[in-house]
Amino acid sequence: MTELIYEQPLNEKIRSYLRLEYLSTQIQSNLTQDHQHRCFYPLFSLCELTDRCDYRSDVLKDIERHIIMLSKWLELPHVDKVQINELINRLIQSKAQLQTSDRIGVHLKKDKFISALRQRFGMPGACCNFDLPQLHFWLAKPWKERQIDLQCWVDQFQPLLTPINLLLELIRSTAEFCPTEAKAGFYQGDSGQPLALIRVKVDVSQGCYPTISGHRNRYAIHFVDFDQLRHTDKTIQFLLATCS
C-alpha cells in the first residue's frame, strides 16, 4: 500500500511558505548528493522568490503568535510541558536569527560567479561550457569542495527557511488525519475556525488524485481519475486533515 499526501494552502502566505519549504527540501538533497549543475535551479528559485518579497515581517509575526499560543498552552493541565518549552525555545532562537540577519540572499547578488550563472540559467541549453566556462571549471572541482561552496550559499537562506519549516511543522500538527470518503468522487467541508491548510492522504491503488479548492472556512475536494483525466464517479476512501 502506497499513500500519497496532497496539500492545499488556503491563503497566499501559506502558499509562499510551502514553495519555500519545497525549495529547502530540494536544496538539502543537493547538499548530500552530487547533482552537478542541477543544484543551482532550487538555489536560483530561492533567489527569485526572496528578491520579489521580503518575508521577514510575516514570518516574525507568525513566530510571535505561536510563542504566545504555546505559552498559554503551558497553563493547561495534562500537557507535555517539556515538548512545548522545546518548541518555544526553537521559535525564540529562529526569531533572534531572523531579526539579526541581513536581507535574505543579498550577499549572493554580489557574488560574480553566481550572478553570471543566474543570467544564463533561464535560457534553454545555456549550461554548455562555451556559454559558461566558469561553471565547467567549478563542476570539475572535487565534490567535497563544491559541497562547501553550496553550503555557504544555502546558509544565507537559513535564517528564513528554518522558521518557515518550523511554522509549517506546527501548522500541520494542529490536525490529525481522519478517515473520510468522497461519494461520486466529491467531498465538501466547512469549519467554524479559519483554516490554513488542507491535507489529503490517498492510496495510489485507487487510481486517482485530488484537486482541492477553498478558502479559510469552506473547501471542496474533487478526485480525478489519472488514466481517464476526468472526474471519477467512484466512492474514494481517503484520510483528511484540516489544519489551522
Per-region residue spans from a language model:
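Membrane-targeting and insertion segments and their boundary/processing signals
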Residues: M1, Q33, H37, K61, ...
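N-terminal ordered "arm"
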Residues: T2-K61
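Alpha-helical rod/repeat scaffolding segments in eukaryotic adaptors/tethers
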Residues: Y6, T32, Q36, P77-K81, ...
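Generic structural signal for well-ordered, non-transmembrane alpha-helical segments
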Residues: I14, L18-E21, T25, F44-D51, ...
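Generic recognition of cysteine residues
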Residues: C39, C47, C53, C127-C128, ...
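Hydrophobic/aromatic-rich structural module bridging two neighboring secondary-structure elements via a short loop
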Residues: D51-F113
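Charged, well-structured binding/catalytic surfaces in domain cores that contact anionic ligands
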Residues: S94-A196
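Extended, charged low-complexity segments
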Residues: P194-S244
